[in-house]
Amino acid sequence: MRIDTSALCDIYSDQVDVVEPIFSSFGGASSFYGKITTVKCFENNGLIAEVLEEEGEGRVLLIDGGGAVRRALIDAELAKLAVDNGWQGIIVYGAVRQLDVLETLDIGIHALAPIPVGAEDADIGEVDTPVNFGGVTFFPEDYVYADLTGIILSPELLDLNELAE
């Protein structure tokens, strides 16, 4: 189902938080939504790989990379792993790389910027902890909705059938 964050904001204005418009879309899917799983790490992606090995149906991986854009936290290999395991999307408060591959994959990917330098492969960081960026605090198990217009957050699953009316 196509997500329209503008319409969701109109319908659920008192229930959603809007993430500051600092992200760009790099994946092949223009919209996505799901329950959040968080990873907090800095310039390393070992924990990201571990989480993406899990079943991702109905889930979005939200990565707090501290806003650093010196090393890419998501590359083609990790994005393909996410697709293979059914993840709906990835949001990176940091950088990504290998855009020519990312844009062909059936997954939504939002990040701050691209850079060709890869991250370290260390398992340093935290999983499923609240993170704050873009003017919003994200809690594990919140729901995130993203399209080319923006990213919104809700503590509860929104009724997407409202979009069809």
From Swiss-Prot:
Subcellular location: Cytoplasm
GO MF terms held by the record: endoribonuclease inhibitor activity; enzyme binding
Keyword entries, A-Z: Cytoplasm
Gene3D superfamilies: Ribonuclease E inhibitor RraA/RraA-like
Domain of life, source organism: Bacteria
Gene Ontology biological process: regulation of RNA metabolic process
Pfam family, one: RraA-like
InterPro entries: RraA, RraA/RraA-like, RraA/RraA-like_sf, RraA_gpbac
Gene Ontology cellular component terms for the protein in this record: cytoplasm
Function field: Globally modulates RNA abundance by binding to RNase E (Rne) and regulating its endonucleolytic activity. Can modulate Rne action in a substrate-dependent manner by altering the composition of the degradosome. Modulates RNA-binding and helicase activities of the degradosome.
Family statement drawn from the similarity comment of this UniProt entry: Belongs to the RraA family.
Quaternary state and interactors: Homotrimer. Binds to both RNA-binding sites in the C-terminal region of Rne and to RhlB.
HAMAP family: RraA
UniProt protein name: Regulator of ribonuclease activity A
Source species of the chain: Haemophilus ducreyi (strain 35000HP / ATCC 700724)
Gene symbol of the encoding locus: rraA
